[in-house]
């Protein structure tokens, strides 16, 4: 396991390095005017622009710029925002919004895991019964209906009949977070329920379950001590990635409820050509995805040490 973990860690770091390099090179292919604010473009002469670019090191050879870029990354220095918040460190610009998305994402993921897994267990336990039909109908509905429609239904029901605020507000964080968290949870609950039901139903057809019944084990013991444990093994691989992706923010949900989180930040940065913010966000999202996959692989091996996730050398 240690050998595989180290190997996957090295692969993840190399992937992050390559993505960061690719993003850096793509940013350098853009016109240099995007490195100035709109006010600077109007006021600066060509000589002043050249001097500013030289001072920022943007006229240095690409290899030299790359070395400086990697050094800055190691020190968590991502530069300053030039258009969204002129002069503010990118870390500060992203940090405030990341905190909001992280809080909503973690709460939504926790709710989704508990409700979704429990729903999947009950569907598997009462397969082809009324509860299973209801759960399946919910899963189909959530996946078939566009997110904007389901968000609108939640908004109307939650605001009209339950009195929750329709827009996110920093003055009333708790109440105004209910509808966004609900919308984030809807699809995740359906996903976890579907996975849990599927894997548990598959396990219920295994020979060892028939043997357990012959030995006289109760349905509850079979379901929770054997079926659920084995069914959760393939699921845990996706849980870290799901959490990290959710924490990264939801563009549609955050736009819909005016949540000042991570979701709209990338599109705003692209539209306003704030290159340092764009560069940092792309790298951040890549890191979240890669770390999620890495943690999922390792977690699956921790849950069931019998599993060998492997290359050819480990299969021998």
Name these PLM-found stretches.
Residues 58-117:
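An internal, D/E-rich "acidic patch" concept
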Residues 23-30, 137-165, 185:
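Membrane-water interface segments at the C-terminal ends of transmembrane alpha-helices
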Residues 54-61, 79-85, 172, 270-276:
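Membrane-interfacial helix-loop-helix junctions in multi-pass membrane proteins
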Residues 16-67, 161-173:
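Hydrophobic alpha-helical transmembrane segments of membrane transport/permease proteins
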Residues 1-13:
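N-terminal Sec/SRP start-transfer signal
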Residues 12, 97, 101, 137-144, ...:
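Residue-level signal for discrete positions within transmembrane alpha-helices
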Residues 2-3, 98-131, 147, 171-316:
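Alpha-helical transmembrane segments of integral membrane proteins
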Residues 44-76, 177-178, 257-269:
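Short hydrophobic, aromatic-rich alpha-helical segments embedded in or entering the lipid bilayer
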